[in-house]
């Protein structure tokens, strides 16, 4: 069950409207690593979790907080679009608005009535393919660290793209929360790795072709990666290096398709 409160988690009001910054913020809302991806990933992982209650609760806590971040960014975008120009009358009144109108996301006015959308800045819709919920919490926690890292990186870049103190205030809060989320997911990952092992999944090592499991194969014309040779991996084994990987699989010969498929291949 979710219960909404009308108060935002943190301030989300700019000093002035800025439709171009509104477009940029769409990446943190509807982009691959944005808050919608975090919200849906963590909630899905939490709902799928049947193990230790602390991990389930951690995921649901954080997924629900991401809802608040979606709300904050959507609100900020709405404020940034207040009084934004969108028609020829605006341009006639003030020709200097041409640059602003050229930099705006046309979908903000055309599709969403000068409101936020679940798209990235170029209008590509957010999609569920960005979400990870594998049922394996070691893998999922690793994804979560990456998601928070990418999100924080993008927020850092957005911070440098504006001098609006209201926008920056919200971004400072998001930076801090993404610090917390990185750290908590790293801690959960470490605990789960101690229990299940470093490699995901940890119960297949007995059947894999282990002679290939710690070989760094040189598939480029550089040799810089040879520096890893002899170093100890996190599982305690040493890396070896293969200068010239060999083709061991032979030449495939697949029979032609059924004539009804019309695969005319010469």
Curated annotation (Swiss-Prot):
Alphabetical list of CDD domains matching this protein: Mn_catalase (cd01051)
Main EC class the enzyme belongs to: oxidoreductase
Residues noted as binding Ca(2+) in the record, renumbered to the chain: 57, 61, 218, 220, 222
Gene3D superfamilies the UniProt entry points to: 1.20.1260.10, manganese catalase, domain 2, chain A (3.30.1530.10)
UniProt keyword annotations, A-Z: Calcium, Manganese, Metal-binding, Oxidoreductase, Peroxidase
Region (Disordered): 243-266
Cofactor: how and how many bound: Binds 1 Ca(2+) ion per subunit.
Biased composition (Basic and acidic residues): 255-266
UniProt family annotation: Belongs to the manganese catalase family.
Domain notes: Each subunit is composed of three distinct structural regions: an N-terminal polypeptide, a central four-helix bundle that serves as the scaffolding for the catalytic active site, and a C-terminal tail.
Descriptive protein name: Manganese catalase
């Amino acid at each position: 069950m979710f219960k909404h409160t009308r108060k935002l988690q943190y301030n989300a009001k700019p000093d002035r409207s800025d439709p171009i910054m509104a477009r940029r913020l769409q990446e943190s809302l509807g982009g691959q690593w944005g808050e919608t991806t975090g919200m849906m990933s963590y909630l899905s992982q939490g709902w799928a979790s049947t193990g230790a209650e602390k991990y389930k609760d951690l995921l649901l806590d954080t997924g629900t907080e991401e809802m608040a971040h979606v709300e904050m960014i959507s609100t900020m975008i709405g404020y940034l679009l207040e009084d934004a120009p969108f028609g020829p009358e605006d341009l006639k009144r003030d020709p200097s608005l041409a640059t602003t109108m050229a930099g705006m996301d046309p979908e903000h006015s055309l599709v969403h009535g000068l409101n936020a959308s679940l798209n990235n800045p170029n209008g590509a819709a957010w999609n569920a393919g960005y979400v990870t919920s594998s049922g394996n919490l070691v893998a999922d926690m690793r994804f979560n660290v990456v998601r928070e890292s990418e999100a924080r990186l993008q927020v850092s870049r957005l911070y440098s793209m504006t001098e609006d103190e209201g926008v920056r205030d919200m971004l400072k809060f998001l930076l801090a929360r993404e610090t917390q989320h990185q750290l908590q997911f790293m801690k959960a990952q470490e605990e789960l790795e101690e229990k299940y092992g470093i490699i995901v999944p940890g119960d297949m090592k007995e059947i894999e072709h282990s002679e290939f499991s710690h070989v760094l194969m040189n598939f480029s014309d550089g040799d810089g990666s040879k520096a890893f040779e002899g170093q100890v991996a996190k599982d305690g084994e040493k890396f070896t290096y293969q200068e010239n990987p060999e083709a061991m699989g032979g030449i495939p010969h697949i029979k032609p398709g059924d004539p009804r498929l019309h695969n005319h291949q010469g």
